[in-house]
Amino acid sequence: MIFTSSCCDNLSIDEIIERAEKGDCEAQYIVGFYYNRDSAIDSPDDEKAFYWLKLAAEQGHCEAQYSLGQKYTEDKSRHKDNEQAIFWLKKAALQGHTFASNALGWTLDRGEAPNYKEAVVWYQIAAESGMSYAQNNLGWMYRNGNGVAKDYALAFFWYKQAALQGHSDAQNNLADLYEDGKGVAQNKTLAAFWYLKSAQQGNRHAQFQIAWDYNAGEGVDQDYKQAMYWYLKAAAQGSVGAYVNIGYMYKHGQGVEKDYQAAFEWFTKAAECNDATAWYNLAIMYHYGEGRPVDLRQALDLYRKVQSSGTRDVSQEIRETEDLL
């Protein structure tokens, strides 16, 4: 393998290791990077990566400091150390490393001892450098009032900066603000536009939302086939709400042929995830014999689960079923 990087142009890995052993920090970083590629956590190569990255980082190598800081955040690693992660990420961030600034913000935001105010500082630095991930993260902080006063207008501003760069989560978050009219005038058409952008990149929440929009005709022309298409996309990623709505569409023949068995299977899939709406729909099917024999005992058990969940009042359905038993 041949590397091309400054002092190590056109050198083999053995030649770079030789330079690294003599104290060349660029060579040390490259060796650390080499061992870090796809290495299993706590494997021999992972230990070598730590060793060489730390040597380079201690000499002030910015990329090594960033990489080392990131490695200290790895879950399940025996080296995981929040304080060391912050220490090395801050070293790199202070040298102007934008990715380190965002990673430092994330570690301060989501780490063992959250410090939202400091996280905002580092997100801001990275966001102002144009980094879409940091812009989305900063938007989230303003939206939720973490480390700053809640400000939907600023959340909207930063989400839009990231969304325009194609950041899928930001596109979804921007759509949420248009949907709810927070930080911007409510606009269902623009909400649907951004949900679709995000959904096309695989965002599960956006896939569910654009399916809902097509189903209800909100911000787009009603289109049951498109609704089913996107519900299935969301369901493939584990969206329980999509399971329920697919079941409903099969039950009522929306975008597909009416199919009680398919409806029952999708409702059951959601019910297994403890979804009360799915319990209710299954109870109805058992109660009235929709696609299966009437089973009042099963219907009653499901109605009682719904009632216990507090999500809807089904006391009348319970009484009616009890009267039939």
Curated annotation (Swiss-Prot):
GO BP terms in the entry: response to oxidative stress
Organism: Escherichia coli (strain K12)
Recorded family membership: To E.coli YbeT.
Key words of the record: Repeat
Cleavable signal peptide: none
Pfam families the record matches: Sel1
Repeat region (Sel1-like), residues: 26-61, 63-97, 103-130, 132-167, 168-203, 205-239, 242-275, 280-305
Statement: the UniProt record of this protein carries the keyword Thylakoid: no
Keyword Repeat: yes
InterPro entries in UniProt: Sel1-like (IPR006597), Sel1_AlgK (IPR050767), TPR-like_helical_dom_sf (IPR011990)
Protein name listed in UniProt: Sel1-repeat-containing protein YbeQ
Database matches in SMART domains: SEL1
